[in-house]
Regions:
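Activation segment
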Residues: 21, 52-54, 72
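Divalent metal-coordination and catalytic microenvironments
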Residues: 15, 36, 47, 67, ...
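Fold-independent oxyanion-binding glycine-rich loops
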Residues: 20-22, 34-35, 42, 46, ...
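Histidine-rich, glycine-flanked metal-binding segment
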Residues: 1-42
Length: 177
């Protein structure tokens, strides 16, 4: 915020800061002595590739160890939804090319119980991640879902129908979260 730091007390309830004071009058049922420490809001990591890691590491280490409380997944245009049944291995392979995680680990680490982006977000929440997860829908998944293997050909141009279908998938994904 650009504000000066303050030395003081704060009280929190249910994950929210509810009161700040500097006169020692902020009482609480539990006291954490943070003398000579810095208390900050959680940090947002706006560029991660934790889309698959949440499947086998719902604490999303080491992000949580660095004060990260919210991560943005779906960067570099690669996501795991939307996906048509049977195309999951291709999305895992595409992610393997971006992130140094084997497609086999991705395939076994995620439940793959979805087709749409909202289903992916629901599946992630069922894993009970320790951090807030927000996402982008990746163009690679959208194009592959609509165009199949043609999406991988750099010279392939989507047809007018494919462009309409791509736009529909993006609208559906945005509406889903």
């Amino acid at each position: 915020s650009g504000s000066e730091t303050i030395r003081g007390d704060m009280i929190g309830k249910e994950g929210e800061i509810t009161r700040v004071g500097s006169d020692g009058s902020v009482g609480a049922a539990q006291v954490i002595d943070a003398t000579d420490r810095i208390v900050t809001p959680g940090f947002i990591d706006a560029h991660t590739h934790l889309d698959a890691q949440v499947g086998w590491d719902p604490e999303l280490t080491p992000s949580i160890y660095h004060g990260i409380t919210t991560v943005l997944v779906g960067n570099c245009g690669v996501t795991f939804a939307p996906v048509s049944p049977g195309n999951e291995p291709k999305l895992a392979e595409i992610m393997e090319g971006v992130e140094d995680i084997s497609a086999k680990a991705i395939m076994t680490g995620l439940p793959w119980s979805w087709t749409g982006y909202g289903g992916y977000l629901d599946a992630v929440q069922k894993l009970k991640p320790a951090l807030n997860i927000v996402g982008l829908v990746g163009h690679a998944a959208v194009r592959y879902d609509v165009m199949g293997d043609r999406a991988i050909d750099h010279d392939a141009v989507p047809t007018d129908d494919e462009i309409r279908n791509i736009a529909d998938r993006v609208r559906e994904s945005v509406a889903a979260g």
